[in-house]
Each structure stands twice: as structure tokens, then as C-alpha cells.
């Protein structure tokens, strides 16, 4: 039984190497960026709940569509200042700073934007480079 299993694994490994080697030899098709001149692209996030790891990807998407010639709008539909320990510890300031860097154009208020009180919300709206 061990010999049969060993033979099976050897054949499976050889097949996977052969498939991988042949795939590497084929040239990848060159993907060209689409011409989106005159187009409007709307990107949005919602219920991020302090998940700050995704803001770099959001910024990259906005930059990509701008590079393709599109006019890009980036919005958030609320609940961005609570959830992640880093964002919660700063009472949303970290999220707003990252949203500034990502190039958000506007953000709506969700119920969690009121978790730290009205005064904090006013402070965050002054820090933001976009209307909240």
C-alpha cells in the first residue's frame, strides 16, 4: 500500500511540474488599459467598520481609473469610524486620515459615526478633506 501511495504521489508531482513548466513557456497576453476618457466611474465603500487595510486598494483603484482617463468619484456610505482597534482608539481619526490619503470625495453618516459623540464628529469633519 505504501508503494502504491508513493507511486501515485510521484506521478501526481510529475504531472503538476509538467503543467507548470508548459504554462510558463506561453507568453502572457499584454493587457492594455481601456480608454475611459469622458467616462464617470463611481467607487464606493460602506460599513468598513475601521477595516483600514483596504484603503490602499481603494486608492489604487481610484488612481487606475483616473489613469485610464475617467472622472472618478469615491464615496463612503457610513460606518467607517468604529470596529478596528486602531480606528476605535483614535475615535475615527485614523480612518479619516486614510480616507483623505485615498482621495475620498464625500462620506455619509452611519449610525456608528455617532458612537463617540457629536463633538468628535464635528472634529472629524474638520479633519476630513471631503464633506461628511
What are these language model-derived features?
Residues 2-23:
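Sec-dependent N-terminal signal peptides of Gram-positive bacterial secreted proteins and lipoproteins
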Residues 24-132:
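Acidic, metal/ion-coordinating pockets
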Amino acid at each position: 500500500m505504501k508503494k502504491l501511495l508513493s507511486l501515485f504521489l510521484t506521478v501526481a508531482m510529475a504531472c503538476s511540474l509538467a503543467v507548470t513548466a508548459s504554462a510558463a513557456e506561453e507568453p502572457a497576453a499584454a493587457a492594455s488599459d481601456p480608454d475611459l476618457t469622458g467616462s464617470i466611474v463611481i467607487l464606493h465603500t460602506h460599513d468598513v467598520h475601521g477595516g483600514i487595510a483596504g484603503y490602499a486598494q481603494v486608492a489604487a483603484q481610484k488612481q487606475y481609473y483616473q489613469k485610464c482617463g475617467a472622472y472618478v468619484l469615491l464615496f463612503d456610505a457610513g460606518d467607517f469610524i468604529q470596529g478596528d482597534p486602531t480606528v476605535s482608539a483614535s475615535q475615527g481619526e485614523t480612518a479619516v486620515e486614510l480616507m483623505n490619503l485615498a482621495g475620498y470625495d464625500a462620506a455619509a453618516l452611519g449610525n456608528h459615526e455617532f458612537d463617540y459623540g457629536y463633538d468628535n464628529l464635528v472634529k472629524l469633519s474638520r479633519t476630513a478633506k471631503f464633506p461628511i
